[in-house]
């Protein structure tokens, strides 16, 4: 397991331990003792785990839930975007952009907006775990090609519901969020 810090405080990119043989690959998604040895926070117990299937070009997010989130691509390729929205954070306003593939996880701290765009022709499967149960009304930021300078790799039509959900598009734009 390899852990890399980012330009956003607490946002970590983790390369999972993998074992490959003739049958395929096993990826160790979470082992508490390995996480603690790597200096990562204890995250259990997970109270909700979701797996989404997302078509090529579609975007999910930007969501800024009030919980920690561990995300990974189970299949396909995706682009991940992260924006620190936390009041008082020394990295507030910082953006991290990553290519995501199986074997890579991202630990998203509470209050950091996160979103992803599927890049694979056959779509992407995105696994995410929460340390709290999701409830309606959690914070987010509207997707636009100009949101915080995020460079989405595929063109986005925010009015196309096959690309951006009505809920995600109804989130406030970044310019309407309260200042620090």
Locations of regions flagged by a protein language model:
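Non-catalytic, conserved peripheral segments adjacent to functional cores
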Residues: 1-100, 122-123, 130-138, 142-180
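Conserved metal-binding segment of the jelly-roll/cupin
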Residues: 99-121
């Amino acid at each position: 397991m390899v852990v890399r810090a980012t330009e956003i405080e607490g946002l970590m990119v983790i390369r999972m331990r993998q074992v490959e043989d003739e049958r395929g690959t096993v990826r160790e998604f979470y082992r508490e003792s390995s996480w603690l040895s790597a200096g990562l926070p204890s995250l259990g117990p997970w109270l909700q785990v979701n797996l989404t299937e997302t078509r090529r070009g579609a975007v999910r997010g930007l969501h800024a839930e009030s919980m920690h989130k561990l995300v990974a691509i189970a299949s396909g390729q995706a682009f991940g975007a992260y924006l620190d929205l936390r009041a008082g954070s020394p990295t507030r306003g910082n953006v991290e952009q990553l290519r995501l593939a199986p074997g890579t996880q991202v630990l998203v701290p509470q209050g950091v907006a996160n979103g992803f765009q599927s890049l694979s022709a056959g779509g992407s499967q995105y696994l995410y775990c929460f340390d709290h149960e999701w409830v309606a009304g959690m914070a987010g930021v509207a997707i636009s090609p100009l949101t915080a300078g995020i460079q989405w790799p595929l063109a986005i039509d925010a009015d196309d519901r096959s690309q951006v959900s009505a809920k995600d598009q109804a989130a406030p734009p970044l310019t309407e969020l309260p200042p620090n």
